[in-house]
């Protein structure tokens, strides 16, 4: 009986301890996710669990767009609506993209999965049949799956930037015959097979128009693989650390090339300009901040924009071709483009010279022969395009021929572009098409008069207008990639004059002689005029809705382009950024904390967090935090420890300095909470002591209760007579 009661008490106590342990474990699990970005919309209550718990309350049909970014998902939910057309699963923990997941979404058009951990791709030849855009940037892909056979894929845009791809195997993209935009930038790509861009049947990848190889380890552009891109219009080779030369017949099979960007490639020392003879449609060349010493001329039929600033050019009158015929060649930032005289040179160049003054120096040297410019044919014309703000303006100029009233109207195409970086991949398809019209409306562009063009009796005027130049054949997919050229912090101002020209409206001739500039007329289409009016509207003097402390804030430069608003002054990318302002920390636990900061007024490409425990020497850091982030968690901290944390901004010029005081303080100190494990074992110990005390007390009480009582028996008193006194013995009962 006694042992049975003790066993029952022990079982009861063990059950109490197990229940307490489970409750503490649930509390600990609830603390693991420090923060969660929820979907704004009808499903705000669905983020209670990271994966299939999202299915609770999710509509089975009718949903076309779903955002699951920043949900810590390790796999996509199995209950996604079949009507989805756009799915954003970026910034999660996805490890694979498989055919069953894509097969359940037959209407999917846009799939965004950048910044995950995807290392494996599994799909069949018909899996991506309806998909139009796929973004797999900044994942862990080391290779792409081979194409199983002919595919009906309609994929037009594929982004693979930031993946550890080392090589492209033959027919890597054969499954995507409709592919138009391919981004392979910032990868470890060092080799491209000759048939990498070949189709399943060995033919070319005929639809590709834009290829971005910026930031890769390629040493040269080879004709073997580029010949399979006959419709290539834009080629980006920015920030190529190993690209040394451009030569050979690499552009022999790409006659449609319009834009070549090799900017910020320090190893590029030689460009054989003869290769551009095979690109009659070339309009933009960017070689800024390379290592070129010369840049020879070639025959070009297009208006050409060239950027050469930041190169160690050697002064030579051969470079004057860039400035002689301003109707055909626009040198971007000519005043900032410098040349140095050759060592031991005895020519007219005595020191560093801006290319904007090169023509004057060469003209004064009688022994120098310049390229023919034939300026007399353009008397009284105001024509040279002006670089203002972020773009090369599209302008129209009136040329009054001596001795006649015929009007020549020339349209200089606008060329607005950028180089792709972390998250932004922009492109604009410049148009070649123009329409004839009898409309006599004339738009003047600010310019510098050609030599000999100014008349003694004429006043010259300069106005400007920005015009869109989107081809009617261009699709929204191509035309949406748009961003301006880099501009100088102090753009040079061109001479502005006034000119009054009287001309009698006549029928405009569109077939001029061979030695004159082609006459291109403004289209009298109402839609183009409406678009032109919208684009030409003056910028509003309002500040952009830019909050430097907002997490995932859209960069102000993009807001400025989108809404024509005013951004705060930012230091350039070549200047070390100012330190961020650390707002503080939140959600402090025993092993983690969430750090908040505000962006500086500088160009920032990424952030870093450095932290160290008080009294310890080892400094820990978190690097490559994306530029739009304003908060980041720190994990695996020591409980009950004081830490010193600093947030640093970084760009190509370097890291910002740590600042521990002042209003722009980038460092702070915090202390983690005591360990939950210690608290748990403390509670267990207290519970154990309470249990032992209870058991001891129970045993004592039980023993006291069941202790037998003392029994009293009858006692007979016997008295004996003392023999000495001879008394009688008396007995009592």
From Swiss-Prot:
Residues 311-364 form the LRRCT domain. InterPro entries: FN3_dom (IPR003961), FN3_sf (IPR036116), Ig-like_fold (IPR013783), Leu-rich_rpt (IPR001611), Leu-rich_rpt_typical-subtyp (IPR003591), LRR_dom_sf (IPR032675). It holds the Pfam family LRR_8. Disruption phenotype: Mice are viable and fertile, but show impaired memory retention. Lrrn4-deficient mice are able to maintain memories for one day in hippocampus-dependent learning tasks, but are unable to retain memories for four days after learning. In contrast, in hippocampus-independent tasks Lrrn4-deficient mice normally retain memories for at least seven days. It is a single-pass type I membrane protein. Residues 698-733 are cytoplasmic. Glycans are attached at residues 70, 183, 291, 299, 327, 408, 469, 619. Residues 490-504 have a biased composition (Polar residues). One of its GO terms (biological process) is long-term memory. The chain crosses the membrane at residues 677-697. Keywords: Glycoprotein, Leucine-rich repeat, Membrane, Repeat, Signal, Transmembrane, Transmembrane helix. It is found in: Membrane. LRR repeats lie at residues 62-82, 83-106, 107-128, 130-151, 154-175, 178-199, 207-230, 231-253, 256-278, 281-302. GO terms for cellular component: plasma membrane. Residues 20-676 are extracellular. Residues 1-19 form the signal peptide. May play an important role in hippocampus-dependent long-lasting memory. This is Leucine-rich repeat neuronal protein 4. The gene is Lrrn4.
